[in-house]
Amino acid sequence: MTVMAESGVVRAGVLDVAFERHGNANGWPVVLLHGFPYDIRGYDRVAAALADAGADVVVPYLRGYGATRFVSSDTMRSGQQAALAHDLLELIDALGLTAPIVAGYDWGGRAACLVAMLWPERVSGLVSVSGYNVQNIPASGQPAPPEDERRLWYQYYLHNERGRAGLAAYREDYTRLLWREWSPNWHFTEAEFTATAPSFSNPDFVDVVVHSYRHRYGLAAGDPAYDQTERAIEAQPVITVPTVIVDPTEETLSSPDSRAEHETHFTNLVELRTVAAGHNPAQEQPADFTAAIQRLHTQA
């Protein structure tokens, strides 16, 4: 049986969050969180499979993407990690979800990790791509080897106004290039890319993205509303909730870590699952990503 998705918008803190919901509202709750530069279309097959398995699956557009909008024009268009965490927490409250499994990659994985880290009682489990997806901003000035720095060109590009103008003018070219670079063995179709590309036309996309890639290096001030949360993150606490890590083996931004390395950040690591995928494993290998979530559900 395939369960059709319903679309909705809910007031959640400073946002009106656009989302799709799959399955039965009385099912076991899951929130799937996309990364940059992707959107909810990357979870279509995962969400359908989980709904068929009895889950209540919520897939939101992050701030700056798709039909999600800021409630007030006065709210800072922040892309900082604490803002993403609060967005997820507010969404869980707004939809009345009880201890969902939260799963994500890139920006979405960061939001999921942070809520699991700072408010562990609010979630029942975590699926995180590439592990401890938490920025250590005080240490961001420490250089990496040149080969690693080269891969981060897309971040440094946005550190000046030429990059901001470039993202605004060439957002589809920029994002398509990142899809190709980060997942070299994923031969996505033009239809797959064009299904997601409209999300980058959100009026706040450029501001949120640029702020994200400046704030993480200490090059832009954060929203004062999140100062307390950012201070809590600086301590780099361990994550104690049941966790499955999905480590992609074809990702070009990072390499898989050993279980021992991951366990320095996760005290309840249920499974370390390596997957033949690049940066977007939910869309590239949906069966593996679905299985990671189901592993947490069946052990609960």
Regions from the PLM with identified roles:
Residues G35, D106, Q283-E284:
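Conserved acidic functional residues
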Residues T2-A5, D16-V17, P29, Y65-A99, ...:
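Flexible "cap/lid" subdomain of the alpha/beta-hydrolase fold that forms the substrate-access gate
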Residues E6-A12:
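Short acidic-hydrophobic surface loop/beta-edge motif
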Residues A12-R21:
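A short loop-to-beta-strand scaffold at the N-terminal edge of the catalytic core in hydrolase folds
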Residues E20-F70:
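Conserved HGGG/HGGXW glycine-rich cap/lid loop of the alpha/beta-hydrolase fold
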Residues Y38-D39, R77, T252-S255, H279-A282:
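Nucleotide-sugar-dependent glycosyltransferase donor-binding/catalytic pocket residues
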Residues V46, V115, A292-L296:
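Hydrophobic residues on the short alpha-helix immediately C-terminal to a glycine-rich phosphate/catalytic loop
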Residues L269-A300:
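Catalytic active-site module of serine/aspartate enzymes centered on a nucleophile-bearing elbow/loop
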